[in-house]
Amino acid sequence: MISLIWTIFILHIAIFLVNTIGAATIDNLLWLLYLKLPTSLYQTAQEQTKLKREVVQLKRDMNNTSSQDEFAKWAKLRRRHDKALSEYEALNQKLSSQKGSFDWFVKIARWLSTTGLKIFIQFRYSKTPVFELPGGWLPYPVEWVLAFPRAPQGSVSVQVWNSVCATAVTVIAEIITGLALQVKGSAQAVPATAKKA
C-alpha cells in the first residue's frame, strides 16, 4: 500500500493540476469525452451537430439568394432554415440541461477526490505520525511545531506535511515553468549571423 507521505504528496499534485488547468476546462473536456461514449446522449449530440451544420448551410444559401428576385426559392429556404433552427434549439436545450446535471456530478466528484480526501486524511490520521524524526535532532520547540496539533512528539504531523507538500509542489511548478520559459526564450533568441562575402 502507498505510504501516507506519497498519498499526501500525490494528492497535492492533483489539487495543483486542477487549480492550474482550471475546473471549467476539465469539466468541458470530460463532457466532450462523455458525449463520445455510447450513451443515449451520443445520438442526440450527433444529431445536434448535424442540425447545426444544416442551419449554417441554409443560412448561407439564404444570404446568397436574393429575396426580391427569387422570392419563392428564398421563402422555401427560410422555412427549412426556421424548422431546422427550432429542432436544433430543442436538442441544444436538452443537451444543456443534461450538461448542467453532468457538471454538478463532476464538481461533487472532483471535490470529494481532492479537498474532501485531504480533509478526511487530516482527521483520520491526525494522531498518526507521517514519519519519525531522529531523537534529539531538533530542539523541543521545533519538534512541538512539527508535531502540531496532535501527532506524537518527535514526529511530523499530517497537517504540517500537508503544508510542506503544498509549498513544495508550488515551488517545483514555478521552477519548471521558469526553466521552460528560459529554454523557450533562449531557443528563440538565437541571433542569425551574416556570412561575410
From Swiss-Prot:
Subcellular location: Endoplasmic reticulum membrane
Entry-linked InterPro entries: Get1, Get1_fungi, Helix_hairpin_bin_sf
Membrane topology designation: Multi-pass membrane protein
Recorded coiled-coil stretches: 43-99
GO cellular component, one term: GET complex
Residues in the Cytoplasmic compartment per record: 25-110, 173-197
Disulfide bonds: none
Membrane spanning stretches: 5-24, 111-131, 156-172
Family membership: Belongs to the WRB/GET1 family.
Subunit text: Interacts with get3.
Cited function: Required for the post-translational delivery of tail-anchored (TA) proteins to the endoplasmic reticulum. Acts as a membrane receptor for soluble get3, which recognizes and selectively binds the transmembrane domain of TA proteins in the cytosol.
Name by which UniProt lists this protein: Protein get1
